[in-house]
């Protein structure tokens, strides 16, 4: 009898975070407005299993608060935003938005979700970088 590894489907919120990272990436590199990116994303992407209202909230609110989010990140990264991989930037922006504004989400959940998203979309070791940066930011935001 062969054992089959059971693949766990990501939660609706994790899928919302994955979609938010993809949309933030697209917004940053395309030069399109947030509204254009969101509309194109919802029309073009598979949104099955996604907490759509949470996706919309995360995407819109992260962009609405981008200056505050970036200001919270910049002291804790070892390079400029221009030198960061755009996916890492999108993951950090989403996580810092959640750490700063979504206080009902435990900080450990925010950091773990960011790490898991980085494992899916980031370079080989980017999840370690994301973890290190967020471990420094969380206490600075009063979340540890």
From Swiss-Prot:
Record keywords: RNA-binding, Transcription, Transcription antitermination, Transcription regulation
User: InterPro entries of this UniProt entry?
Assistant: NusB-like_sf, NusB_fam, NusB_RsmB_TIM44
- Tell me where the signal peptide lies: none
Briefly, what is this protein's role?
Involved in transcription antitermination. Required for transcription of ribosomal RNA (rRNA) genes. Binds specifically to the boxA antiterminator sequence of the ribosomal RNA (rrn) operons.
Question: What protein family is recorded?
Answer: Belongs to the NusB family.
- HAMAP family linked: NusB
Instruction: List this protein's GO terms for biological process.
Output: DNA-templated transcription termination; transcription antitermination
Xref: Pfam families: NusB
Single GO molecular-function term? Answer: RNA binding
Could you tell me what this protein is called? Transcription antitermination protein NusB
Q: Organism, per UniProt?
A: Haemophilus influenzae (strain PittEE)
- Which CDD domains does the UniProt entry name for this protein? Terminator_NusB (cd00619)
Q: Where is coiled-coil annotated?
A: none
Gene of this entry: nusB
Q: Name one GO cellular component term.
A: cytosol
């Amino acid at each position: 009898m062969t054992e089959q590894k059971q693949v766990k489907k990501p939660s609706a919120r994790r899928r919302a975070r994955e979609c938010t990272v993809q949309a933030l990436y697209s917004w940053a590199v395309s030069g399109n407005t947030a509204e254009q990116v969101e509309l194109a994303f919802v029309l073009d992407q598979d949104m099955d299993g996604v907490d759509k209202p949470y996706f919309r909230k995360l995407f819109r609110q992260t962009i609405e608060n981008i200056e505050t989010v970036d200001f919270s990140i910049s002291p804790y990264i070892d390079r400029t935003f221009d030198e960061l991989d755009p996916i890492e930037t999108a993951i950090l922006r989403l996580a810092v938005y959640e750490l700063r504004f979504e206080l009902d989400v435990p900080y450990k959940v925010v950091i773990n979700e960011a790490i898991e998203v980085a494992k899916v979309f980031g370079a080989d070791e980017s999840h370690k970088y994301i973890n290190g940066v967020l471990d420094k930011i969380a206490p600075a935001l009063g979340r540890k």
